[in-house]
């Protein structure tokens, strides 16, 4: 391919690559990190923001709520027993994609760190990655993919106003 690869910038969360490197010639697509701060954060708002910018670029949420990670783990006084689950992962994905994201990143706390018994866990890893890789949220991303691939992408338009549940309703 002549060394031509897609390049983006992974912002600290919550954050937007467009806030830091929006006009960079090397930036091929905008990435946001909607973060692990709390449940029901509307990931679609990040996508809507970047889709309205110029230069126009595809948008992806590169780090949404990871399945199995403690909710708000970096917030003082968080409860380490409260974890994001498959519903949280699914919600983040659908909200972003229906807002016009070019794709979505699924994350699992135990998988990203390849945690296994006998290894020091980071951010509350508590299940072997080899088990967590089959968590419900991972399987549900396949349903989202199949649904979106069955659509005619050229005719799709973001319609957040049709979502009747969530922070804005």
Describe these PLM feature segments:
Residues 58, 67-69, 85-169:
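Aromatic- and carboxylate-lined catalytic core of secreted/periplasmic carbohydrate-active enzymes
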Residues 3-4, 24-118:
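Catalytic-core region of carbohydrate-active enzymes that cleave or remodel glycosidic bonds
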Residues 15-24:
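Distinct, well-ordered alpha-helical segments
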Residues 11-15, 35-37:
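Short beta->alpha connector loops
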Residues 6-8:
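Substrate-access "cap/lid" subdomains that shape
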């Amino acid at each position: 391919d002549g060394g031509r690869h897609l390049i983006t910038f992974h912002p600290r969360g919550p954050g937007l690559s467009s806030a830091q490197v929006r006009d960079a010639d090397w930036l091929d697509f905008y990435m946001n990190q909607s973060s692990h701060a709390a449940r029901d954060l509307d990931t679609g708002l990040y996508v809507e923001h970047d889709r309205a910018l110029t230069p126009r670029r595809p948008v992806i949420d590169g780090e949404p709520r990871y399945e199995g990670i403690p909710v708000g783990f970096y917030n003082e006084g968080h409860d380490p027993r409260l974890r994001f689950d498959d519903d949280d992962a699914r919600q983040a994905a659908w909200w972003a994609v229906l807002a016009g994201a070019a794709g979505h990143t699924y994350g699992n706390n135990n998988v990203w760190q390849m945690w296994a018994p006998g290894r020091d866990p980071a951010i509350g890893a508590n299940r072997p990655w080899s088990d967590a890789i089959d968590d419900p949220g991972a399987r549900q991303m396949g349903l989202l993919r199949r649904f979106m691939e069955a659509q005619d992408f050229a005719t799709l338009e973001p319609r957040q106003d049709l979502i009747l549940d969530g922070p804005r309703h």
